[in-house]
UniProtKB/Swiss-Prot annotation:
The keyword Translocase applies. This is Lipoprotein-releasing system ATP-binding protein LolD. Coiled coil: none annotated. It comes from the Bacteria. It is a peripheral membrane protein. The gene is lolD. One of its GO terms (cellular component) is plasma membrane.
Length: 221
């Protein structure tokens, strides 16, 4: 049985808007195990991105707990660096660095071996069809290619959990399928859990579990 690596317990998120309280999430629960592929769907504005930000320790819940069992890190920035990987719809690549340099950056920040980082990054980029674009600058890449570089960057530190917000939103169907196959490989071979917010229902139904966020609650779809 796979170990539990993330627990969202009774999570609520409320905002003050003048004298009005805006309730985004209410008493939401989610348990994530090693190697699980989880998709979260829901209408725009339903709180999906807020949920990912809380799970990724980028935002604090109004109530509830984010529990990462057995993590050797206590400080949030260290957990984010060593334990979590993030993919956003916007790639956020560093424009003055090559595709390869963008991918290895998190590994170098972690103080790990550069040679090994280059080897791993080259393999990931090749798996994503970018083996001939290693030394291209972001400005020389298409939108889909930039997003694939960002996906490769999220994988370089071999995180326990990847949090992906519309990771294939700018990709064509063929590349979307390649990304899913890479996610599947990472989940099965490295026991990495992937939590993905998506509007792509075909992709969502390929995942191990599918949840729908509606009326501030998360339910099996």
């Amino acid at each position: 049985m796979n170990n539990t690596i993330l627990i969202l317990k009774n999570i609520s998120k409320h905002y003050s808007q003048g004298k009005t309280i805006v309730r985004v999430l209410d008493d939401l629960n989610l348990t994530v195990n090693e190697g699980e592929l989880i998709a979260i769907i829901g209408s725009s504005g339903s709180g999906k991105s807020t949920l990912l930000h809380i799970a990724g320790l980028l935002d604090k819940p109004t109530k509830g707990q984010v529990i990462i069992p057995n993590s050797k890190y206590q400080k949030y920035h260290l957990i984010r660096l060593h334990y979590l990987g993030f993919i956003y719809q916007q790639h956020h690549l560093l424009k003055d660095f090559t595709a390869l340099e963008n991918v290895i950056m998190p590994r170098l920040i972690s103080g790990l071996d550069q040679k090994e980082a280059i080897e791993d990054a080259t393999k990931i980029l090749d798996d994503l069809g970018l083996g001939k674009k290693l030394y291209n600058m972001p400005g020389e890449l298409s939108g889909g290619e930039k997003q694939r570089v960002a996906i490769a960057r999220s994988l370089i530190n071999k995180p326990k959990i990847i949090l992906a917000d519309e990771p294939t939103g700018n990709l064509d169907p063929k590349t979307t399928n390649e990304v899913f196959n890479l996610f599947l490989k990472v989940a099965r071979e490295q026991n990495t859990a992937i939590i993905m917010v998506t509007h792509n229902y075909e992709l969502a139904h390929k995942m191990d579990k599918l949840y729908k966020l509606k009326h501030r609650l998360l339910n099996i779809a």
